Amino acid sequence: MPTLGVNIDHVATIRQARQTVEPDPVAAAVLAELAGADGITVHLREDRRHIQERDVHILRQTVQTHLNLEMAPTDEMVAIALEIKPDYITLVPERREEVTTEGGLDVAGNLSQMRKVVAQLQGVGIPVSMFIDPERLQIEASAQIEAKFIELHTGSYAEAKNEATRHKELTILADGCNIAINHGLRVNAGHGLTYENVYSVACLKGMEELNIGHTIVSKAVLVGMERAVREMKLAINGKF
């Protein structure tokens, strides 16, 4: 079954709501790892609405599993990534007015820019993943620019209002996995996954890691980070 990358952005969201020092996302990362998280994910946004550069620097020194840095493919973010050197990077689209990431990257429509960013990062040994919708065009473009991974956007599946739509979206994700694998790409997934809907995605052939944040942090507010992470690990394995 896939491994679990715990996204701790929303621990920082709570902190930034009061512009104070707590809760500390670094402490949350430690607790998540102790509970069995296989990796820690953070999104350093251009508007710095939650995770701050200082957080990423400290996490780079303290995370014992692997650190996945989500970021927009901009010169500013590339410079930061080259300084910090996370274990791997997921390139994501970004709009300042969005509440959360609303869709996948348009890799096919920005091939030259994406190829340049991927080459810069992978040239210093940082594997790059492209956060994309499960569309053949975007998957093939990601292979064309020689990214190592893709992360399939699971939002449409997660937001499905009925079982028929959910099944349709799951089939699209499964097809995306197969296309990616046939093009030599490794496959992760994330966005909107919960304790209730994660298992079907976890069962997709070739799925390596699921990056999950909001639902874990939401549960952690009530039961603690360690229990929230342990229960997500169980959910991924169909035992929750």
From Swiss-Prot:
<keyword id="KW-0808">Transferase</keyword>
<protein>
    <recommendedName>
        <fullName>Pyridoxine 5'-phosphate synthase</fullName>
        <ecNumber>2.6.99.2</ecNumber>
    </recommendedName>
</protein>
<keyword id="KW-0963">Cytoplasm</keyword>
<feature type="binding site">
    <location>
        <position position="45"/>
    </location>
    <ligand>
        <name>1-deoxy-D-xylulose 5-phosphate</name>
    </ligand>
</feature>
<dbReference type="Pfam" id="PF03740">
    <property type="entry name" value="PdxJ"/>
</dbReference>
<feature type="binding site">
    <location>
        <position position="192"/>
    </location>
    <ligand>
        <name>3-amino-2-oxopropyl phosphate</name>
    </ligand>
</feature>
<dbReference type="GO" id="GO:0008615">
    <property type="term" value="P:pyridoxine biosynthetic process"/>
</dbReference>
<dbReference type="InterPro" id="IPR013785">
    <property type="entry name" value="Aldolase_TIM"/>
</dbReference>
<feature type="binding site">
    <location>
        <begin position="9"/>
        <end position="10"/>
    </location>
    <ligand>
        <name>1-deoxy-D-xylulose 5-phosphate</name>
    </ligand>
</feature>
<comment type="function">
    <text>Catalyzes the complicated ring closure reaction between the two acyclic compounds 1-deoxy-D-xylulose-5-phosphate (DXP) and 3-amino-2-oxopropyl phosphate (1-amino-acetone-3-phosphate or AAP) to form pyridoxine 5'-phosphate (PNP) and inorganic phosphate.</text>
</comment>
<comment type="subunit">
    <text>Homooctamer; tetramer of dimers.</text>
</comment>
<dbReference type="GO" id="GO:0005829">
    <property type="term" value="C:cytosol"/>
</dbReference>
<comment type="similarity">
    <text>Belongs to the PNP synthase family.</text>
</comment>
<feature type="active site" description="Proton acceptor">
    <location>
        <position position="43"/>
    </location>
</feature>
<dbReference type="InterPro" id="IPR036130">
    <property type="entry name" value="Pyridoxine-5'_phos_synth"/>
</dbReference>
<feature type="binding site">
    <location>
        <position position="50"/>
    </location>
    <ligand>
        <name>1-deoxy-D-xylulose 5-phosphate</name>
    </ligand>
</feature>
<feature type="active site" description="Proton acceptor">
    <location>
        <position position="70"/>
    </location>
</feature>
<feature type="active site" description="Proton donor">
    <location>
        <position position="191"/>
    </location>
</feature>
<keyword id="KW-0664">Pyridoxine biosynthesis</keyword>
<feature type="binding site">
    <location>
        <begin position="213"/>
        <end position="214"/>
    </location>
    <ligand>
        <name>3-amino-2-oxopropyl phosphate</name>
    </ligand>
</feature>
<feature type="site" description="Transition state stabilizer">
    <location>
        <position position="151"/>
    </location>
</feature>
<dbReference type="GO" id="GO:0033856">
    <property type="term" value="F:pyridoxine 5'-phosphate synthase activity"/>
</dbReference>
<comment type="pathway">
    <text>Cofactor biosynthesis; pyridoxine 5'-phosphate biosynthesis; pyridoxine 5'-phosphate from D-erythrose 4-phosphate: step 5/5.</text>
</comment>
<dbReference type="InterPro" id="IPR004569">
    <property type="entry name" value="PyrdxlP_synth_PdxJ"/>
</dbReference>
<feature type="binding site">
    <location>
        <position position="18"/>
    </location>
    <ligand>
        <name>3-amino-2-oxopropyl phosphate</name>
    </ligand>
</feature>
<feature type="binding site">
    <location>
        <position position="7"/>
    </location>
    <ligand>
        <name>3-amino-2-oxopropyl phosphate</name>
    </ligand>
</feature>
<feature type="binding site">
    <location>
        <position position="100"/>
    </location>
    <ligand>
        <name>1-deoxy-D-xylulose 5-phosphate</name>
    </ligand>
</feature>
